[in-house]
Amino acid sequence: MAEKHRQRIVIAMSGGVDSSVAAALLKEEGHEVIGISMQVWDYANFAAPEGEKFDTCCSLDDIHDARRVAEQIGIPFYVVNFEEEFRRLVIDDFVDEYFRGRTPNPCVRCNQRVKFELLLHKARELGADFLATGHYARRVRGEDGLYHLLRGLDPAKDQSYFLFTLTQDQLARTLFPLGEMTKEQVRRLAAERGLRVAEKGESQEICFVPDDDYVRFLEEERGTGLMAGEIVDRKGNVLGRHGGTYRYTVGQRRGLGIAHPTPLYVVGVDAERRQVIVGPAEELLATGLTATEVTWVVPPQGQTVEASCKIRYRHQPVPCTVAVRADGSAEVRFRQPEKSVTPGQAVVFYRDDEVLGGGWIEGRL
């Protein structure tokens, strides 16, 4: 590589195979690569069962793995402590949302407020030209001079849903080295290079709830016995009682403790009234949704956008019409009714492979 193309790049290293391969590839391309891991949560209070490890990211074991990979490929490595900021910007929001009767997505908030804000700022302090991550997503510069965010080439691993909040300035300073690869290719590259994390499993749980017990975590944060109340149907008929609205999410069927001739699902959570609203499966259907904090990767042309949208990560995109409002909100109408529109989750707008933007689901239509 010619010297003029050599860049200083900070790579966010989670200790997993993806960011490890991304770091190795950037180093092989001749760049000056600096590895950084984020310390965002104190795991001292969590002990995995003997002989087991939590399937999460950002643990001390993961940071140790990242450090060893950095040593193996020959790049400097640092740990930045964002515990205080992560608590304020991600965890407190997560807890608040549940106690408002919503179901949050902390991974999007982490990308928005920590990784592509605080860590990107840290990269700039180090004089880096770019921040690189192991996300399966693509970033291209169009003929219009603007940066466009695209799905990762591997449909099974595409993570563009979690990145819809990225701005033009952030995209201009971000690299996704794995965007054109499949997971199988990444593992093969790791094995070929003898990276010690080549066969490491993928993180499955939220980093600060490593045992996946949300109820325990929320009650430790706010106390037990809060938000208990009635389970009702759409007409207000009382069908039972519950131990806390934060224990329920739209679409949930198990754990209701109600004897009923037909299957019942959670169709709404009213935290203010401390009510969990249930109904048959057809009551989960919605013709659309309202969204707040709507942001656009590239500003839309006009007040109406024809797109496809995902209302949760593993949801297949569905055709929709987005009515853009001046206050930063939007009204989204589906072509066909969709199930389980969940307040607090992200709705992300696509056109083919391109991420147009997204927002946070406020309610259903």
UniProtKB/Swiss-Prot annotation:
One CC-aspect GO term: cytoplasm
An example GO BP is: tRNA wobble position uridine thiolation
Q: Where in the cell is it found?
A: Cytoplasm
GO MF annotations, alphabetized: ATP binding; tRNA binding; tRNA-uridine 2-sulfurtransferase activity
Reply yes or no: does the keyword tRNA-binding apply: yes
Q: Quick one: where's region Interaction with tRNA? A: 157-159, 312-313
Keywords of the record, alphabetical order, are:
ATP-binding, Cytoplasm, Disulfide bond, Nucleotide-binding, RNA-binding, Transferase, tRNA processing, tRNA-binding
Catalyzed reactions: S-sulfanyl-L-cysteinyl-[protein] + uridine(34) in tRNA + AH2 + ATP = 2-thiouridine(34) in tRNA + L-cysteinyl-[protein] + A + AMP + diphosphate + H(+)
The protein's enzyme class: transferase
Please name every pair of cysteines joined by a disulfide bond in this record: C110-C207
The residues responsible for catalysis, as annotated, are C110 (nucleophile), C207 (cysteine persulfide intermediate)
Which Pfam families does this entry report, sorted A to Z?
Answer: tRNA_Me_trans, tRNA_Me_trans_C, tRNA_Me_trans_M
Which InterPro entries does the protein's record reference?
Answer: MnmA-like (IPR004506), MnmA-like_C (IPR046885), MnmA-like_central (IPR046884), MnmA-like_central_sf (IPR023382), Rossmann-like_a/b/a_fold (IPR014729)
Q: Which family does it belong to?
A: Belongs to the MnmA/TRMU family.
Q: What name appears for this protein in its UniProt entry? A: tRNA-specific 2-thiouridylase MnmA
Q: What high-level taxonomic lineage is stated for the organism? A: Bacteria, Pseudomonadati, Thermodesulfobacteriota, Desulfuromonadia, Geobacterales
